[in-house]
Every structure is written in C-alpha cells, then in structure tokens.
C-alpha cells in the first residue's frame, strides 16, 4: 500500500475533482467489455450445449425417416409409456432424434405434448440403462434451449434423478447425466445454486482421475466452468473451496480444451470480488497461471490474461502476488500481439498496475512498458486507446514526480491530447484529469507542459470542451484554461518585464525564462 494511506488519498482527491479513488482506478471488466466477453463465450465456452446426432444422418434424412414411419408426437408419447421395452425404447429414441436436429429442434412442441414426466420416469429405470441413456440425452437437449425450457426440465424434478445417475455403473449414462446437469447449471445462478444444494460437487469431482476418457473429462471440466460462472451472486464459498484443488490439478492437463476451460473457470472465480481472489491466490495456482500468458494457443493466452487481469483488480497485496511471478516479462509480446483484443486486455491489465502503489508503477516503468502503452494510446483501436488513457491517467495519480516526469519525456502528451476530441465522455474526462494532474505535478515547469499541450493542438481541443454538455468536463476544461492558459503570465512574472534604460528604451534579456523541452519537474 502507499506509505501514508491518508496522505495518499488526500493527494488523489486534491488532484481529482471527481474524487476518483483507488477503487475507481482499479477497474473490473464492465459494460465496455461485454462484446469481448460474449465473443469469447460464443467461441469457447457455451453455457449450454445440444448433443448432436450420434449417427451421421443429415437432418433431412432424419425427418424423412420419421415421415416414412409416420412417427408423430402423439405416437411417440403413446409408445413411450408402452409396457413393451422395445417399443418404449424406440419411442424415446425417436424423441431424442427429433431433439438432436441441428435446425430448430421442436423443444416446445415436445414440452407441450406432456412427454417430460415420461422421460423423467425413464431415468429411474436402472433395469434398462439404454432407456436411461436415451431419456437423459433427450432431456439434455431440452435443457440446452431457452431459460424457460431449462426451467421446464428442472420443474419436472429431473435434477435429483440426474444426480442419482452420476453413480450409475454405466459410463455413458453417467456422462449424459453430467452433460444434462451442465446445461441446467449454465442457466444462471438460481439453477446453479439449486443443483449445488442437492450435492453435485463431490460426485462430479470424483470423476477426475487418470483413467477417465478424455471426452468425459472435457464434459466434467465444462460443468465446473458453469459452476464458477455468474457473480450475482457468486457461487457459495464452500463450493469454491471444493473446486479449487481440482482446478489446480487440471491446469497441468495437456488437452487444450480442458486447459482453456480450467483457466476460464479461474477467471470467473477471480471476477467475484477480493475474497474469491484471495481464495484463488491461497490455492497456489497463480505461479502456474502466469506462464500461460505466453502459451502458443491464443485461446489459452486470452483466458490466462483475463484471469490474472481480474486478480490485479484486487488489493495492492493481491496485485503484488502476480507481479512477483514475473508477469510483466510477458507483456512486450502481449502488447505487440497481432490480435487487437489481446492488446486491449493487456493494456487493461497494466492500467490496474499503474493504479497501484509507487513500487508497482516503477515495475511497469522498469519493464520498459510505458513506450508500448503510449504506442497503443496513439495507434491502437479505440477500445485499446481507452484502456491506455486509463493506464496513463492512473499513473498521474499514483506515481511520484519523477515517474510522471518520465511519462512526459516519453512524449505522452500529443497522443493523450488527441483523445480529447472523441465522442466518449468518459475518455475525455479521464484525459483531462490526467493532463491536470501532470500540470499540477509539474509545479514551476507547468508552463513547459502547457507549451507542449498548445503545440500539439491540445489547447484548442480543451477550449472547445468548455462548451461540452457534460458539466464535469466543461468545468475541468475551464479550470485548466484558467489556471495554465490564461494569457496573463507576463503580469505575474517580473522576470519577463524588460528593464528601462537611461535612454527611455526597454532592454529585453533574450535568455530570460526561455523554456526548453528538456526539463525536470
């Protein structure tokens, strides 16, 4: 933490008209990253998954097969309650095939037909594992639909039976039950906590062993991810404590799908507040997480960057745990990565380091990352520029004079000022805050900073912002103009007033108060 917390907070508040404090500076992923998060979930981590056809039949072939047999929902419903096990299995299988169609499976039609209680009843048939398997598959695909469709499965009292099937001696039945539970848990925190309350965690984790087939382990890991999802509310602390040792084992796995899901699970846990961050740290997984930032697979890097990024939204002490793992050595490559979204996440991470204490700010400087942040400020796409603006502005609050001076020497002001003309009010305010902090920190050298701002076109932009609709912005712009660009400096500085000679003429000293771009605050 800062050497004198009360002094540090006073300094922050004196610099920031908005009273931006450490909590504000350290930013969790918020609405500006919704698109990024959704893209990742769509690409890697679907909350719910439909089980496709086992056979290689096209949908049209399946439909034609049903039509040829004149199979109707009424017939399926009637035959699914038959006393003839062959007829019953065939009917449940027909329902499953309908639900496994890639194109618009008729989930609502089947729910309305009243088949759910029949399928749930089939889960009880320990004497007929094939029937249990087909019924579980059909219910899995119903639960892969909308929230209302998932709720229909839950309300049919299927969950206790799926949990019971986790102890089935037939592996395909176990695996199908795991898949079904994953879809139900993935519906949201209410379903997640309901399934947890019925005791899903221990039997689920018991499947993690060297002998488990890789496809089964992938499903188990995916369900663990869903257990870690959602932070409103986050999963129960006892559940997190149970899951973390399993994640510490799975992070060594050589299968990329399992590794990616494991790291995403950790990223969800670290997104749940400082208490959960501490639990992840205490598990000892961080030293194994950090090296994944340089993994050859981009999807592993992406997940790892999010996980460590969430950790550094915590306290200075929690942030230091990550820094102690030599995390900054991975950032030159991340900041120059061909994928823009990696650049953006990397700069977001660093913005939370520059929101830390002065030693942490110095670590970013010593790692040679400031010029790379400034490059992203100037050349990155807008989302990355926005994160870079936060990184710079945070440094102007947290940093010492010499650290802010270094920032200016790296020519931060021109690209910083360029962002004053964007439409995003938050970015404009962050930049104005940063510029004002630099001017305050410069003290007697403020006129040099003002000159740089004017030469790069920043003054003109600040003048325009005095007419901004946002009250905070126009007040801040006015204050900067009034204090540093008021035009009456000559009246205030006697050194600039020429001395009168005996002949009544004035003698100007050409060396008086000449400003240079080389300066020390």
Curated annotation (Swiss-Prot):
Function recorded in the entry: Functions in nuclear protein import as an adapter protein for nuclear receptor KPNB1. Binds specifically and directly to substrates containing either a simple or bipartite NLS motif. Docking of the importin/substrate complex to the nuclear pore complex (NPC) is mediated by KPNB1 through binding to nucleoporin FxFG repeats and the complex is subsequently translocated through the pore by an energy requiring, Ran-dependent mechanism.
Subunit structure, interactors included: Forms a complex with importin subunit beta-1. Interacts with DDX21. Interacts with NCBP1, NCBP2/CBP20 and NCBP3. Interacts with RCC1. Interacts with ZC3H11A.
Region NLS binding site (major): start-end pairs: 137-229
Keyword Heme appears in the UniProt entry: no
Region (NLS binding site (minor)): 306-394
Gene Ontology terms, MF aspect: nuclear import signal receptor activity; nuclear localization sequence binding
Lineage of source species: Eukaryota, Metazoa, Chordata, Craniata, Vertebrata
Expressing tissues: Ubiquitous. Highest levels in heart and skeletal muscle.
Protein name per UniProt: Importin subunit alpha-4
Modified residues (Phosphoserine): 56, 60
Record region (Disordered): 1-29
Result when mutating residue 328 to M: In SPG88; decreased interaction with RCC1 and DDX21; no effect on interaction with NCBP1 and NCBP2
UniProt motif Nuclear localization signal: location: 43-52
Keyword Acetylation in annotation: yes
């Amino acid at each position: 933490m800062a050497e004198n917390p009360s002094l540090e907070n006073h300094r922050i508040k004196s610099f920031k008209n908005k009273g931006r404090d450490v909590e504000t500076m350290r930013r969790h992923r918020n609405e500006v990253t919704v698109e990024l998060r959704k893209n990742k979930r769509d690409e890697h981590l679907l909350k719910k998954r439909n089980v496709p056809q086992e056979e290689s039949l096209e949908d049209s072939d399946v439909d034609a097969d049903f039509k040829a047999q004149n199979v109707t929902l009424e017939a399926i419903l009637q035959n699914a309650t038959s006393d003839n096990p062959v007829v019953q299995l065939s009917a449940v299988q027909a329902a499953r095939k309908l639900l496994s169609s890639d194109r618009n499976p008729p989930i609502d039609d089947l729910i309305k037909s009243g088949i759910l209680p029949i399928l749930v009843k089939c889960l009880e048939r320990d004497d007929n594992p094939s029937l249990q398997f087909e019924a579980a598959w059909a219910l899995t695909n119903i639960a892969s639909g909308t929230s209302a469709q998932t709720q229909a499965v839950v309300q049919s009292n299927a969950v206790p039976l799926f949990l019971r099937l986790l102890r089935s001696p037939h592996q395909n039945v176990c695996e199908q039950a795991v898949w079904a539970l994953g879809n139900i848990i993935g519906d949201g925190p209410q379903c997640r906590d309901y399934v947890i309350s019925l005791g899903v965690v221990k039997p689920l984790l018991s499947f993690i062993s060297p002998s488990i087939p890789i496809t089964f382990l992938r499903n188990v890991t995916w369900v663990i991810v869903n257990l870690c999802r959602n932070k409103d509310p986050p999963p129960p602390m006892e559940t997190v404590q149970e899951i973390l040792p399993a994640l510490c084992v799975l992070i060594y796995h050589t299968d990329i799908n399992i590794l990616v899901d494991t790291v995403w699970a950790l990223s969800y846990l670290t997104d749940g507040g400082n208490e959960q961050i501490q639990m992840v740290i205490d598990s000892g997984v961080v030293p194994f997480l950090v090296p994944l930032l340089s993994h050859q697979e981009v999807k592993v890097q992406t997940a790892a960057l999010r996980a460590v990024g969430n950790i550094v939204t915590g306290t200075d002490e929690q942030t230091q745990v990550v820094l102690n793992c030599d995390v900054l050595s991975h950032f030159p490559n991340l900041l120059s990565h061909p994928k823009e979204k990696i650049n953006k996440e990397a700069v977001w991470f660093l913005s939370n380091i520059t929101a830390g204490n002065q030693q942490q700010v110095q670590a970013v400087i010593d790692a040679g990352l400031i010029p790379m942040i400034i490059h992203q400020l100037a050349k990155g796409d807008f989302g990355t520029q926005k994160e870079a603006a936060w990184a710079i502005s945070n440094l102007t609050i947290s940093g010492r004079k010499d650290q802010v001076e270094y920032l200016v020497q790296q020519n931060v002001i021109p690209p910083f000022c360029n962002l004053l003309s964007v439409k995003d009010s938050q970015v404009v305010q962050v930049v104005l805050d940063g510029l004002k902090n630099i001017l305050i920190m410069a003290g007697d050298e403020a006129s040099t900073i003002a000159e740089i701002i004017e030469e790069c076109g920043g003054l003109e932009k600040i003048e325009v912002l005095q007419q901004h609709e946002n009250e905070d912005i126009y007040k801040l712009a006015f204050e900067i103009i009034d204090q540093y660009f008021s035009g009456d400096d000559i009246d205030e500085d006697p050194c600039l007033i020429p001395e009168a000679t005996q002949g009544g003429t004035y003698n100007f000293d050409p060396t008086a108060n000449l400003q240079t771009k080389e300066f020390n605050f």
